[in-house]
């Protein structure tokens, strides 16, 4: 079971004409609408309506643009499951717009997280399981070792990309030979949570929630 499947709905929402479909915003770092119903036809009809609405949706105040220079940006990652005999769909709102500051994407892991994760966020990761580059196994072990020995992280090409992050960990965590690798792994998990936050089109702030509600309200 993926973490997203266990995540609860934190705010119920309603769509006119779809009273048979329970809908809500999921408590998750990315922006997710969950639909649940026994009526598969109504569920898929509403999901399609949300997808089409999102594809054409622009909200400049929230930095969401359906298109720039003719290139479409909005899409949805859908995740389907059965839950206690009901059909359930999680619709994850995505947007691939880029800017000079974020050439790989505004809603993509930002530069400061690239030492851990630079690649695109795929379906498995959206659901809460980190798929991390193989290079990290060796690199994180080297980071842990240098933290224990108090060695210079910038002097070794394996640890140099992680130096800023590791030095910040060193300031707030007690590192011992016994716990060093575990601490580094825990901190890597926190970076992955940040990766998902960066990929979320609506941030988990009051402003972000308001903007999310604006989108939901205009779905027709």
Regions found by a protein language model. Name each.
Residues 1-48:
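Catalytic or ion-translocation cores adjacent to nucleophile or general acid/base/metal-coordination motifs
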Residues 15-17, 28-29, 73, 108, ...:
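Generic, low-specificity signal for short hydrophobic/alpha-helical stretches with a mild N-terminal bias
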Residues 34, 38-80:
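Active-site/ligand-binding surface loops and adjacent short beta/alpha elements
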């Amino acid at each position: 079971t993926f973490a997203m499947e266990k995540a609860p709905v934190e705010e119920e929402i309603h769509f006119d004409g779809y009273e048979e479909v329970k809908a809500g915003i999921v408590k998750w770092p990315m922006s997710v609408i969950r639909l649940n119903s026994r009526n598969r036809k109504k569920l898929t009809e509403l999901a399609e309506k949300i997808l089409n609405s999102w594809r054409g949706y622009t909200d400049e105040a929230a930095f969401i643009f359906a298109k720039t220079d003719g290139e479409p940006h909005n899409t949805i990652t859908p995740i389907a499951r059965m839950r206690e005999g009901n059909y359930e769909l999680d619709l994850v709102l995505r947007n691939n717009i880029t800017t000079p500051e974020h050439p790989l994407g505004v809603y993509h892991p930002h530069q400061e997280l690239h030492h851990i994760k630079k690649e695109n966020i795929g379906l498995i990761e959206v659901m809460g399981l980190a798929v991390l580059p193989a290079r990290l196994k060796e690199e994180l072990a080297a980071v842990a070792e240098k933290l224990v020995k108090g060695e210079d992280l910038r002097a070794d090409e394996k640890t140099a990309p992680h130096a800023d992050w590791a030095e910040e960990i060193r300031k707030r965590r007690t590192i011992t030979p016994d716990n060093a690798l575990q601490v580094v792994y825990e901190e890597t998990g926190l970076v992955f949570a940040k990766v998902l936050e960066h990929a979320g089109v609506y941030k988990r702030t009051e402003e972000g929630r308001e903007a999310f509600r604006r989108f939901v309200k205009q779905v027709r």
